[in-house]
A protein has these predicted regions:
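Extracytoplasmic/periplasmic substrate-recognition and gating elements
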Residues: 79-80, 85, 180, 259-262, ...
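Conserved N-terminal structural module of periplasmic/extracytoplasmic solute-binding proteins
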Residues: 8, 20-122, 136-140, 184, ...
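Hinge/lid segment of periplasmic solute-binding proteins
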Residues: 115-167, 308-310, 376-380
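Short helix-initiation/N-cap motifs at beta->coil->alpha
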Residues: 90-99, 189-195, 266-280, 325
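Glycine-centered hinge/linker elements that transmit conformational signals in sensory
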Residues: 198, 235-271, 301-303, 312
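Short helices/loops that flank or line small-molecule/ion binding pockets
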Residues: 97-109, 176-177, 195-204, 274-286, ...
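Long, aromatic- and glycine/proline-rich binding clefts that accommodate carbohydrate-like moieties
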Residues: 359-411, 418, 446-453
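Periplasmic solute-binding protein
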Residues: 122-129, 148-184, 213-235, 258, ...
């Protein structure tokens, strides 16, 4: 038994000894130097994009730019300006003025951007000169000078940008002219030519008139005579309202009415109750010539009418004028976001916005370089319209002299009415004018302190 225990011990010793020897034979290894690990820079937390600024835009829907087209244009703007959201409010035209007047008068609740088509609102518009000077992509030179001067400028301030253009001109029905064997009018025709042509076209048996009458005194035709209601410095009507030029313009109007070649106010009123206005008479061939605008031009094109366009008739030796208009678009001076409002205004009324409204609506832009891209720009009637737009504007004087419409016009209305209704003899026109000089001067003196000269 003892022998077995001894043998077992010997076996264990033999097996363990080499292991102990092996372990003890290796030298202690030299530790490897630690390799420095790169510093881990924590990833920055993503910065949240700032919330877009919302600006309020008040507008109206029209034949030139529908609500749908304007909302789509605003979306185009937002897509390229993700920092700005436009809240579009489309108001009825009939209520726009009252709502704007109330908001501007209260000094709160007015839109950031809107039409400022009432000159009485101009004091509440933001002066745009600093924004124009800071914008390398914008220049007043983009626009027709006449429309910039009359719809962007207020005194020496820039209070808005002019959107679109419109003008009166004479449209003539080629079918009526051809039937009567009368030559078409040309751009250099005169006021006397107008009466002569209208008389030749008139045919009572067909209930057809040759032409129509001006819409009021001291517009394009009166300016073509060299007539002005009062002095440039707004000091007096003497020598202006009773000048030879003014009396010649009123006398021409009397001759036109007396020719019987135009519908009377009573006839137009009856036709109006039947839903027949001047453009309807023109398209139906009952009016050989009519003083219309670019909207009527598009209506005539859509109706496939055969027509031409010439400026309103002029006077030999005098500068020729046209009666044009544009709409002032402005920023409210109380806006909390003037820079964002400028970015939208300069888009809406700049090349991008006006081209969008032209291509998708019926707007004729106030920017010549954009207007030149109009789809039918090469058509004769469009080229004729463009030539009208290039003329001097009566509005340049009228806009700078607000007291004509602000008082003087009402004071002299009787003479216009008497001529239109055939209630005055030709030779009595000078005396009638002299009788109105006192009331006109009083109206001018009352108005100048109120509206300026």
């Amino acid at each position: 038994m003892a022998t077995k225990k001894w043998l077992l011990l010997m076996v264990v010793t033999v097996m363990v000894a080499p292991l102990l020897t092996a372990c003890g034979a290796e030298p202690t290894p030299t530790p490897e130097p630690a390799v420095a690990q790169p510093t881990q820079v924590p990833e920055p937390e993503p910065t949240a994009a700032p919330e877009p600024v919302t600006i309020e835009w008040w507008t109206v829907s029209s034949e030139e730019y529908t609500e749908e087209v304007q909302r789509a244009m605003a979306q185009e703007f937002e897509a390229s300006h993700p920092n700005i959201k436009v809240n579009v409010t489309v108001l009825p035209s009939s209520g726009f003025g009252e709502k704007m007047t109330t908001a501007l008068g209260a000094g709160e609740g007015a839109p950031d951007v809107a039409f400022f088509w009432d000159n009485n609102w101009f004091p509440e518009a933001l002066e745009l000169t600093p924004y124009i000077e800071a914008d390398p992509d914008f220049s007043p030179d983009l626009y027709f000078p006449g429309f910039w001067n009359t719809r962007a400028m207020w005194g020496d301030k820039v209070v808005g940008l002019p959107l679109g253009v419109g003008a009166n001109f004479v449209m003539y029905n080629k079918d009526v002219f051809d039937e009567a064997g009368v030559a078409y009018p040309t751009d250099d025709w005169t006021t006397e030519d107008y009466i002569d042509i209208a008389t030749q076209l008139t045919d009572p048996e067909q209930k057809r008139w040759g032409g129509d009458r001006p819409r009021g005194p001291f517009r394009a035709i009166f300016f073509n005579y060299g007539a002005r209601p009062y002095a440039d410095d707004s000091s007096t009507v003497e020598g202006y309202l009773n000048s030879e030029e003014t009396l010649a313009a009123y006398t021409w109007l009397w001759d036109l009415v007396d020719s019987g070649s135009t519908p009377t106010p009573a006839e137009l009123e009856v036709l109006g109750t039947e839903g027949t206005g001047p453009v309807d008479l023109f398209l139906s061939g009952r009016l050989g010539m009519a003083t219309l605008n670019q909207g009527h031009m598009l209506n005539a094109k859509e109706a496939n009418a055969s027509f031409g366009i010439v400026p309103e008739p002029g006077v030999e030796g005098q500068t020729r004028y046209m009666h044009g208009w544009s709409l002032t678009c402005s920023i409210w001076k109380g806006t909390e976001h003037p820079q964002e409002a400028w970015e939208f205004l300069s888009y809406w009324v700049g090349p991008e916005g006006q081209k969008y409204l032209m291509d998708n609506g019926n707007l004729f832009p106030s920017i010549p370089s954009v207007l030149d891209t109009y789809a039918d720009a090469d058509k004769d009637y469009v080229q004729a319209f463009f030539r009208v737009l290039a003329q001097d504007q009566d509005a340049e004087w009228l806009m700078g002299h607000p007291c004509y419409r602000g008082g003087v016009q009402r004071a002299i209305q009787d003479l216009w009415d008497k001529i239109m209704f055939g209630d005055i003899a030709r030779e009595d026109i000078p005396a009638e004018m002299e009788s109105l000089m006192g009331p006109a001067q009083d109206a001018l003196e009352e108005c100048v302190p109120r509206l300026g000269g």
